[in-house]
Amino acid sequence: MKSYFFLLIFLCVSCFEKNTDIDRLNNAANNPFRKDSNKIRDKYRNPIDTLTFFEISRDKKILEIVPGSGWYSEIISHYMKNTKNFTVAIYDKPPVKILNKIQDEFINYFSLNKDKFGEINVIKIDNNYELKDNKEKYDLVLTFRNTHNWLDSGNAKKLYKSVNKILNKGGVLGVVQHRANENSELNFKKGYVKESYLINLIEKQGFELLEKSEINSNSKDLKNYKKGVWTLPPRLVEGENNKAKYLEIGESDRMTLKFIKK
């Protein structure tokens, strides 16, 4: 009877902690200080479901690789506030000029808004696509819609091999990437990648696929645009040409993959 009582207490505490964590993640996604232009994309990017799928937790050391303008960083940093457990990896020498501006704006934005989001640690990716961090091992590494660039430049294997080195044993890698049709030819310049191709490449760098999700799928995505995935929102590179059509399609069809370090 006594053991049953303690089991009941344990289950109640676990349930409370889980609910508290979900509430905290919801609060981070609904943070009033998030940019409005980011909030309106939640219906496409599904941040709460995606981060829950990747098993985000405040007691984990988390690394986001190439955060861009900080769409996900706004949410993760607020969720991880006061833990000092959230780090981003940016390029030491960006491969294209526009990334200099994007990275500078990212650093300035989050430095000026620590009280609104939380502190973010920064490490660098060197010219050999090695993650330079001699201090930490991470429990969860995330990257969103970046892999086509690394594949196009021939650096994806090196980058994911480096991720494997800085993950703790049993650590999780979460990847979201624009998804090509399986019968299509490889063309990373369009932004799309075959799911089977990417799984195979990442597993060869010391990972095992744990699970995949259709959280970010979009069956309306035709994937046959001359200007690639950037034809769709939010970029809409064709301007007013067929804008209504592309808005109706929405953002790209994306794979959502969860790997574990072997």
Segments (PLM) and residue ranges:
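A short acidic, Gly/Pro-enriched loop at the edge of an enzyme's catalytic core
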Residues: 131-141
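S-adenosyl-L-methionine
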Residues: 100-130
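Short glycine-dipeptide loop
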Residues: 59, 82-83, 167-173
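Conserved class I S-adenosyl-L-methionine
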Residues: 58-68
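Conserved beta-strand signature within the Rossmann-like core of class I S-adenosyl-L-methionine
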Residues: 87-89, 170-179
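A short glycine-rich, Lys/Arg-flanked "PGG" loop and its adjoining helix->strand segment in the class I
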Residues: 77, 156-169
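Class I SAM-dependent methyltransferase Rossmann-like catalytic core
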Residues: 21-58
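A short, conserved alpha-helix within the catalytic core of class I
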Residues: 126-127, 149-162
